[in-house]
A protein has these predicted regions:
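The substrate-binding groove and active-site-proximal loops of carbohydrate-active enzymes
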Residues: 54-65, 90-107, 144-164, 188-199, ...
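Aromatic- and acidic-residue-enriched segments that line the glycan-binding/catalytic groove
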Residues: 98-106, 117, 127-153, 203-208, ...
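N-terminal carbohydrate-binding accessory modules
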Residues: 25-83, 113
């Protein structure tokens, strides 16, 4: 046994104990203040040598406006939770190689400190892969600029990038581990790796990277589905399992066989589910979940609710899935039908689970914070717009097609332009479209292709020589789960052909839409792919929802912040606009709509619409 492995085993035994017994009735829960040691002891966890049952809920700092972190944490404490869990999203913090951002909304250390101040321990899941229905599973898109990159493997280039990231993250969060007086009692190694592969050498590399990055004063552990646990776990670390509502007894029975001496914990209890564009809105039965949670707690098992509060995948950060070969991009809302809604309202599910926790622990939690209901604000009147064609940046000339990543672009849109020399008819084929394209001939819309529908070609009539071909492509979200990672470059990633002949000599326009200040609006409303601009007054900022039922497909920006995507196929038809992102007085909104039409009014309403699909 190597010295490093020996040290790792000692660290695991020191830091991975969480007892599976509830806090004694009518006692106070342990405080996260001071130094603590969490360890696994047989089938339960212990905190400082005393049995400790983890009652956790997931809240992702990046999906909640910073001004609301404390409100959501207080609501977790008021439900009876003693712990919160969060992923850390690499792509938010290292937006280009070696350039890190932990400020403002990205100040994850402040989120952890606020959790401690509110009486909560923290489970940290730093990945580097996180899944989470998040673009590229949290990996930064710039990794894919390397044509030989193989993420989530022992590929030297990937390990070097992951090492730099985790070491920098350690500077932020290692001091906040429970062994150092912080609230972080546990740190997850990778994330459900057993669903991806079985390379234990790779898992050991990530384990040791975390230790070397300073994550050695909290319990390290792994998490997988029970069936995948042998592939994704490490023998020296505790292993927890993830499953959805209705599966608890069967999944824990599997864990009993796989790890008869290990702690009993559900690392992700899916008390809701996420949505894809064009598919149904998911809900789960709160009464059945309350019964199942009561059973788990009565057994002394520890639980992390995934999610407690889902929030919003603001901007471009929604992920996607590949299921049986079908691409499914996630909606902007991460409401998840969980105890606390997208805008922070407490659902019936919240109070049912709260009652269960109080009954099982004997502890009366504090009262929830006062509600902050969303409000309807005055409708926004649009009077100015500009077509995207009037606002193109300097193009990149290329003989062949280039992806977004080839051009150093991470998110947004990209325009491919070339000339067709001779009039002809035939099939226009886009090989490897990622993810949605509109095709224009001499500025006239000719059709759209959607990866979601497995569309890659359409018949076109080129009626004139020297016809301009424009292909406007949206990156609808990179796949975040499965074996698709190394193929998730955005834009067009292979050739475009017309009548089986490759098209060349492209002018390529990156359109990240990260700065819209230079747009030149005219006092009219255009149609097609357009930017629409308006100013609107707010007397008292409050949460509200932008009603997108009159819009087509695109993105909304308010006061320079990208709120997220809208699409008239549903099921999501509103976009959450947090009150703290509004100003008293004048505010600015920009809507980019690929299918724009001159409808001058967009309402702002008091409720989310998450379950309305087009016919």
């Amino acid at each position: 046994m190597s010295l490093k492995r020996s040290i790792a085993g000692c660290v695991a035994s020191l830091t991975l104990a969480v007892a599976s017994y509830a806090t004694p009735a009518n006692s106070m829960p342990p405080s996260p203040a001071g130094m603590h040691t969490l360890r696994a002891n047989g089938d339960h966890f212990e905190l400082d040598g005393n049995p400790f049952q983890i009652l956790s809920g997931a809240i992702h700092y990046s999906r909640v406006p910073r001004a609301y972190w404390r409100d959501r944490l207080r609501k977790a404490r008021a439900m009876g939770l003693n712990t919160v869990e969060t992923y850390v999203f690499w792509n938010l913090h290292e937006t280009s190689p070696g350039q890190f951002d932990f400020s403002g909304q990205n100040d994850v250390a402040e989120f952890v400190r606020e959790a401690q101040q509110e009486g909560l321990f923290v489970i940290l899941r730093p990945g580097p892969y996180v899944c989470a229905e998040w673009d590229f599973g949290g990996y930064p898109a710039w990794l894919l600029r390397d044509p030989n990159m193989e993420v989530r493997t022992s590929n030297p280039a990937f390990i070097a990038a992951a090492s730099r990231w985790l070491h920098r993250l350690g500077q932020e969060l290692a001091p906040l581990q429970s062994g150092n007086g912080g609230p972080i009692i546990a740190v997850q190694v990778e994330n459900e790796y057993g669903s991806f592969g079985s390379d234990h050498k790779y898992m050991e590399q990530i384990h040791h990277l975390l230790l070397d990055s300073g994550f050695n004063r909290a319990m390290l552990y792994t998490a997988d589905g029970a069936d995948e646990l042998p592939n994704g776990s490490l023998p020296e670390l505790p292993a927890v399992i993830n499953f959805g509502s209705g599966d608890a007894k069967a999944e824990f029975a599997k864990l009993d066989k796989l790890r008869p001496r290990g702690p009993r914990m559900c690392g992700e209890y899916w008390d809701g589910w996420f949505d894809h564009w064009g598919e149904k809105h998911h809900t789960t039965d709160p009464d059945e979940e309350a019964k199942e949670l009561e059973w788990m707690l009565a057994q002394g098992y520890s639980v992390n609710l995934y999610m407690f509060h889902g929030g919003t995948s603001f901007g471009w950060m929604n992920g996607a899935n590949i299921d049986a070969g079908k691409y499914g991009p996630d909606v902007t809302s991460y409401d998840y039908d969980v105890p606390v809604s997208e805008n922070g309202e407490l659902r019936r599910k919240y109070f049912l689970l709260r009652d269960v926790i109080q009954k099982q622990t004997g502890i009366t939690p504090p009262a929830p914070p006062a509600p902050m209901p969303a409000k309807a604000l005055a409708p926004i009147e649009f009077k100015a717009s500009t077509p995207i064609w009037d606002s193109l940046p300097r193009p990149v000339a290329s003989q062949q097609i280039l992806s977004m990543e080839d051009l150093g672009q991470n998110y947004g849109y990209i325009l491919y332009r070339t000339n067709i020399a001779h009039a002809q008819s035939g099939e226009l084929r886009i090989n490897e479209l990622h993810s949605y394209a509109q095709i224009y001939l001499d500025g006239i819309f000719a059709g759209a292709l959607d990866r979601r529908l497995d569309q890659s070609s359409l018949s076109v009539q080129i009626q004139h020589d020297n016809t301009r071909l424009d292909i406007l492509v949206e990156n609808s979200g990179r796949v975040n789960f499965g074996h698709q990672f190394s193929h998730e470059r955005a834009g067009i990633t292979r050739e475009v052909t017309l009548a089986n002949q490759p098209l060349i000599n492209w002018q390529i326009y990156p359109l990240p839409m990260d700065n819209l200040n230079s747009l030149d609006y005219k006092a009219r409303l255009c149609t097609g792919a357009c930017f629409y601009h308006a100013s609107f007054k707010v007397d008292q900022p409050a949460d509200t929802f932008i009603d997108g039922r009159s819009l087509g497909k695109g993105e909304v920006f308010v006061n320079g912040r990208a709120l997220g995507r809208f699409w008239n196929i549903g099921p999501q038809r509103t976009l959450y606009l947090p009150g703290p992102w509004l100003k008293t007085g004048e505010n600015e909104i920009v809507i980019f709509d690929m299918n724009g039409k001159p409808d001058p009014t967009v309402p702002m309403i008091s409720n989310a619409i998450l379950d309305e699909r087009s016919n």
